[in-house]
A protein has these predicted regions:
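P-loop NTPase motor domains
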Residues: 1-176
């Protein structure tokens, strides 16, 4: 039984964690992989050709990268939504960010943008995509935890068995 992991997202008394932004700090280049995979997930869920576009991708990419720059102050999907909507939290993250491209984006591009590109217009457009996960009482405790309950790499390397219950009955189609 030690080689079998059973993950049932609908089991709410003690939810397992799955931080979709978690990466191995020994390999900082994984941050780009995480961002690209998240964009791929959102594309599959929302058909980003019609619901996204270059502005969505630019703000989303820089929000996730900013969150990933300082995992100690939070690096979950909840924190991505928060970094977009909460200026004080965004400033905290920026004060700890060592990526000059990300800092430049938030200080020079997003911070100074007006009209349709302003944060006031862009933020609800992006955070609305996160609401599927964050407003769901089953999913929020799973994706809002900092440390995942299991590591996919470890499962594969140690030849463990991962069983995931993705029944749509309680989770809904998008969350499954």
């Amino acid at each position: 039984y030690e080689d079998v992991i059973y993950f049932d997202p609908s089991y709410t008394p003690r939810p397992m964690a799955l931080n979709m932004l978690e990466y191995d700090a020994r390999y900082p280049e994984q941050k780009t992989f995480v961002v690209n995979e998240m964009l791929s997930i959102f594309n599959k869920l929302f058909d980003m050709k019609t619901a996204g576009g270059p502005m969505f991708e630019q703000y989303f990419r820089n929000a996730v990268l900013l969150v990933l720059e300082d995992p100690e102050s939070g690096s979950t999907l909840v924190d991505v939504s928060r970094v977009l909507a909460d200026k004080a939290f965004r400033e905290l993250k920026l004060s700890r960010c060592t990526n000059p491209i990300v800092v430049q984006f938030w200080r020079e591009i997003a911070g100074k943008a007006g009209g349709e590109a302003s944060l006031a217009n862009i933020v609800p457009y992006i955070t609305s995509k996160f609401d599927v996960f964050l407003s769901n009482d089953i999913m929020r405790p799973i994706v809002g935890q900092q440390k995942s309950s299991f590591q996919f790499r470890e499962v594969m390397d140690n030849k463990k068995i991962l069983l995931v219950n993705l029944s749509k009955g309680r989770l809904g189609d998008i969350n499954a």
